[in-house]
């Protein structure tokens, strides 16, 4: 480490009662920017320190007087009731069962016959409005004559009467004496006009502010709590809380067809990122992105008019911005700041095109859930930094920062010392690598239904949080975030529209469970798509499949990539066929860097067997975990699961080299002889 003291590129939080601590840490950590946070205020004494001042700005809350005066323009969310079984006689379906009444209030103000939907889930058909009634006092839908032993659900609109992020912060921090902040809908006419005027008033009264840190814009990701204040449903990419009759009527005019609540509710799955998206949902996303970014531009233009920068927090009310989408570049946002949970979430920030600079808010957040007696913030900080550092070396963010209550952190001197070392190391790394282009060994394309719009966010339910069911897949994206590859995210629709999109790729990766958006589902029934991918490999490309790649039962195959990868899944349909290919070949190029020539497959996959001609690298109890297969001039590699670890990252690196090796020629292969 260079002993020369560098400063800058660091943002720290402050509060009214933390002025001396802020000044001390500015000096110690070399911070050149100060910010407020939710639940804190910026001290007047720090306005003239010479540091850049960030002001957290909420476009949708912190103005309950307006929200209460305009209850028709409070934000709304689509909710689905629990499944209810009809027995004999009429069926009553309570709407608020299992939901927080502090958070949600049924919207029966608007036309419920138009904006609600009762669905017979046994047939999949909606009931006509005349076939059900609403008991307002009981907040229940009544079906007088249901089909016996059919199941029914109700899709309805509910007002968000407490901002879910404010509710989360209140619950986590034990706030008991705060007014519930009501989120208002900036998209609607009265609030739209008021919000622009409100922003101007803020800028005029805060001349010392350099950066308006929008947290964020208009629509929160889907976040619902139950009656015990527990998180009930979360989708960091969810659009279910970006709705209102006003917005939906505008969508109908643009789309040219009637809106159905089912387009959002999606059988109760809410179009989460594992669902193969419908045409209607993709239409809605595209509409929302155009409308949201146009309104964002109105606000950033005002910020620029006052000579300030507009920064967007990548999270909270960010739905519709989608920085990897087609229209974000027109938003006028100067900078992006986001929470860094690991390497992939760092790339989620640093890869965003069209902004002047990016900033990563590192963990831990200075909240009591970590900073308490017996807490170990140093451990969390080390894990966070070491994991993210790999990705910084590939595509650096321009700044780092922290958030929360600074005084809490000051009670942990070892933590302050460790963060000081992180700040110094980040500045040294940045100075050495910014402006350079890292060497890329291969061009890798991650193939799924979402493509570039969900770049680096694959398999993420909530921001960077562990899920037993997907860590074996998220590990692939995490490994790629710090690997020497040019990584792109490609959709099946991209391949359908232009098969030549594969010409710029050396190796394709398809990872996930069968019939999900990550592996493709029904897209494999489109011969234009399946043949283009097979042609790509046959002509010398590489294909790596993880989990159940191409998993979709169709025309005698469960794994639609079985012919390429040389493996298939036993679902019972092929039990009658004997299998004889079980010999392992662990002394293989892919496993050369793995201890004992073995790997951690995480949850792995059951019942995978090899076809004839496939080279099994690892099988356990006659279930294939790792295999390689030649296909024309290309190669396929199958991996049952790949949680992130150093050894697994090396195995994936070698698998990518191996899978595309056959078409590169002896001259190129010789360059990699040290690795063989």
Regions found by a protein language model. Give the residues of each.
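Short, Gly/Ser/Thr-enriched beta-strand-loop segments that form substrate-interacting elements
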Residues: 610-623
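Polysaccharide-binding and catalytic clefts of secreted carbohydrate-active enzymes
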Residues: 72-330, 348, 434
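Hydrophobic targeting/anchoring helices
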Residues: 46, 66-67, 199-200, 210-217, ...
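A glycine-rich, often tryptophan-bearing local segment used as a flexible ligand/cofactor-contacting loop or short
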Residues: 519-597
